[in-house]
């Protein structure tokens, strides 16, 4: 799984949790 990527409009960016506060994958 990747982390640190930017989320798209559906908060999808990787297989890990997407932080809506920072709009990034954690």
Curated annotation (Swiss-Prot):
The keyword Zinc-finger does not apply. Expressed by the venom duct. The keyword ATP-binding does not apply. One of its GO terms (molecular function) is toxin activity. Disulfide bonds join 7-18, 13-25. Keywords: Disulfide bond, Knottin, Secreted, Toxin. GO terms for cellular component: extracellular region. It is found in: Secreted. The presence of a 'disulfide through disulfide knot' structurally defines this protein as a knottin. The cysteine framework is VI/VII (C-C-CC-C-C). This peptide corresponds to allele E1k. Has not been merged with other alleles since they may differ due to geographic variation (see strain in PubMed:19606224). Belongs to the conotoxin O1 superfamily. This is Conotoxin Eb6.16.
